[in-house]
Amino acid sequence: MTTKSLGSFNSVISKNKIHFISLGCSRNLVDSEVMLGILLKAGYESTNEIEDADYLILNTCAFLKSARDEAKDYLDHLIDVKKENAKIIVTGCMTSNHKDELKPWMSHIHYLLGSGDVENILSAIESRESGEKISAKSYIEMGEVPRQLSTPKHYAYLKVAEGCRKRCAFCIIPSIKGKLRSKPLDQILKEFRILVNKSVKEIILIAQDLGDYGKDLSTDRSSQLESLLHELLKEPGDYWLRMLYLYPDEVSDGIIDLMQSNPKLLPYVDIPLQHINDRILKQMRRTTSREQILGFLEKLRAKVPQVYIRSSVIVGFPGETQEEFQELADFIGEGWIDNLGIFLYSQEANTPAAELPDQIPEKVKESRLKILSQIQKRNVDKHNQKLIGEKIEAVIDNYHPETNLLLTARFYGQAPEVDPCIIVNEAKLVSHFGERCFIEITGTAGYDLVGRVVKKSQNQALLKTSKA
């Protein structure tokens, strides 16, 4: 999960200060940025300090129990720290699908907003009475909305769709976000150009299911995402384009060809596979089989040897036998996945999987997670050792979270916030964050690489070197 306090921005009103906390995924962060943009446009002022805020907006995640527990912890903290008469507004997925879990805090909450109702943030904080507005619609249907970026200046997320057509047995997202609603091409192009004109160097396309983009706008069975990529890549400018959240059967041959041929489209995909055993995949109501997954991975790595693949898997799905888990462990051990997120199955109410027999004990799930983590760590160690001595082009992100004596950087195989990074311990040549430099890899630290800047990039454009 990602926890992000949105930064301070200039405004003209000093007594109407707002403080945002955005929990969960990058899609939630974009929603928070839209709400922040609406309030700044109305004349409110953002503050980094909870104690200074007149309005505290908590944008929640509800995908897993752990995410809901995090939101409750933040509510307790806000209640303890906020100044007298400051109002708390809770929005996001938790209000849409788990409002009952907020009952113990309702006397402290001024307003509830559904995850699709962010355009009502102004009326929520200005309401004299406590209340709520919760629906499954989306501000995407409104067209253009204000937005205040909160990410570092050199990268930003671009949400191209809301909702999901899939019905995975373990997932509550469709019930929260509703049906698929894609932004029209002209709206996306307008937002894209705004980002490029702001000198954003890395634009990350996101949706609940990016590969389904446009399928609600057209009866054409060809990939609408591929068409969108072609249009975006026609745009002039110095930028990288990254894709997150795709199903393996949605990555067309044309998209693969673009990754290989166009230096602006990063050879990186985030594909949540969830499992590899056919019976489990069927029980999960996934759309691909083991054979299809392996065929896709083989084709992708053959056509784009330098590609980096991120994925996620679930351990302890109801009925998962030791043999079926071992099949997953063997698959992970083969090293197909570069960056892996491993999740314990969470029994979510009102999902088909919650009603399945043979729910797996927590201790067994935790043991299986530990085994997969150890396997993936060996894969990462083996790969990272091959990179020692290599000079890799990377973007300088920020200071290291633990000390300003170190910097963090990322090369094309590392997405912000979810993947490991490069820890830079020698950076005399760096003049600003967002700059692209060549970094010599000198060592490793856990999942991260360690290196020193040896020279600046000449044309500030990505050079796609082969993977080690």
From Swiss-Prot:
Co-factor remark: Binds 2 [4Fe-4S] clusters. One cluster is coordinated with 3 cysteines and an exchangeable S-adenosyl-L-methionine.
Binding site for [4Fe-4S] cluster 2: C164, C168, C171
Binding site for [4Fe-4S] cluster 1: C25, C61, C93
CDD domains: Radical_SAM
Classification via Pfam families: Radical_SAM (PF04055), TRAM_2 (PF18693), UPF0004 (PF00919)
Record keywords, A-Z: 4Fe-4S, Cytoplasm, Iron, Iron-sulfur, Metal-binding, S-adenosyl-L-methionine, Transferase
InterPro entries: Elp3/MiaA/NifB-like_rSAM, Methylthiotransferase, Methylthiotransferase_CS, Methylthiotransferase_N, Methylthiotransferase_N_sf, NA-bd_OB-fold, Ribosomal_uS12_MeSTrfase_RimO, rSAM
GO biological process entries: tRNA modification
Catalyses which reaction(s): L-aspartate(89)-[ribosomal protein uS12]-hydrogen + (sulfur carrier)-SH + AH2 + 2 S-adenosyl-L-methionine = 3-methylsulfanyl-L-aspartate(89)-[ribosomal protein uS12]-hydrogen + (sulfur carrier)-H + 5'-deoxyadenosine + L-methionine + A + S-adenosyl-L-homocysteine + 2 H(+)
Domain of life: Bacteria
GO cellular component, one term: cytosol
Subcellular location: Cytoplasm
Classification via PROSITE patterns: MTTASE_N, MTTASE_RADICAL, RADICAL_SAM
Domain spans labelled Radical SAM core: 150-382
Domain TRAM: 385-455
Domain called MTTase N-terminal: residue spans: 16-130
Obligatory cofactor(s): [4Fe-4S] cluster
Catalytic activity, EC: 2.8.4.4
GO molecular function: 4 iron, 4 sulfur cluster binding; aspartic acid methylthiotransferase activity; metal ion binding; protein methylthiotransferase activity
Function: Catalyzes the methylthiolation of an aspartic acid residue of ribosomal protein uS12.
Family designation: Belongs to the methylthiotransferase family. RimO subfamily.
PANTHER family per UniProt: RIBOSOMAL PROTEIN S12 METHYLTHIOTRANSFERASE RIMO, RIBOSOMAL PROTEIN US12 METHYLTHIOTRANSFERASE RIMO
Record's protein name: Ribosomal protein uS12 methylthiotransferase RimO
Organism: Chlamydia pneumoniae
